[in-house]
Amino acid sequence: MKKDSYSWWTKRISAMAKLYDIVRIDHFRGFDSFYAIPAKDDTAKNGVWKDGPGMDLFNVLEKKLGKLPIIVEDLGFLTPSVKKLLKDSGFPGMKVIQFAFDSREDSDYLPHNYPQHCVVYTGTHDNDTVMGWMKTAPKDCVRFAKDYLNLTKEEGYNWGMMRAAWSSVADMAIVPMQDLLGLDSKARINIPSTTGGNWQWRATPEQIDNKLAKKLHKCCLLYTSDAADEL
């Protein structure tokens, strides 16, 4: 791809920028290094790690397309070189609140550890919904989440977790529609490493009414910098 100045990537990102306000690039660590498996092999045992394009690609994209509204998925185990690439790129990484409560150890996903330059999610397409997670996660994890976030049935567990996202220092918060609607695991988008039944959920017009819109609007205003003037 470098030989043609990353033509495919340039066209792809350019097209996405026309369709969406923000583009998210998943599997960011692959731009630092990736595991290459021979196409003819049936298993991954003969694969080898290879260097990714690194900043060379992102420098070319910026030169051709200018500054782009990009979020990068930097979840999971990150090597020092991946962290350096993220810093050098200037793109915001992701924080998923659900990931914060897997253990009692201090986690980078706990809101008090967020840097400002990041994007916080209650969950992604690969997570259960908040309400589903509250029912299926280990009891100690749920208890930790309730204590840390002061989650209550009265407020709604989903609204409590959204409150945590909005009130964090993260530059941006993104909430899946299923969490906004308070839906359970039946509305989950995807279960990784499974086939069938994924990517089928759709919101309907009947689920989104003025009452919900007004509540969301108030919450968004509450956590803006000029909230006092708006409320």
Show where each model-derived region lies:
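A short acidic/small-residue loop/turn micro-motif
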Residues: 209-210
